[in-house]
Amino acid sequence: MQRFNINWTAKTLCNQMKKGAVNFDNAVQRSLVWDDSKKSLLIHSMLYGFAIPAMYFTRDENGVYDSLDGKQRSNAICEYMNDEFCLTMDTPPVMDDDGNEEDFTGMSYSQLPEWAQDRIKDFSLTIYYYDGMTE
């Protein structure tokens, strides 16, 4: 069994999920449990450029990734980028590139200014994956 790492942007992760190249239906993954407040704090961390913990996948012979860790984060990111929830009212403000404080509470992804959308979609996610892992 070998471990590799890749860096995907949030946009790449969502595209891979959309085309079925990432699977979250396995015994080690719990069901989706994060509420919008927790999801909003993750998006806030991305807007600020804070480090997000790495995700862990296995990869099968067809190149499909099976998630070992990262289901909540992956789904929160893609749900937000697909306008499936708005940032909650307790989401802290964010600084723009000029040092101005911006309040995005109650906003969906498509309502954000372009610079904020870019920070999210271009956010780099570290993914470790294992080839040759058996059940």
PLM segments and residue spans:
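A short, surface-exposed helix-loop junction/capping segment
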Residues: 19-27
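Basic- and aromatic-enriched surface patches that contact anionic nucleotides/nucleic acids
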Residues: 1-12, 26-36, 40-135
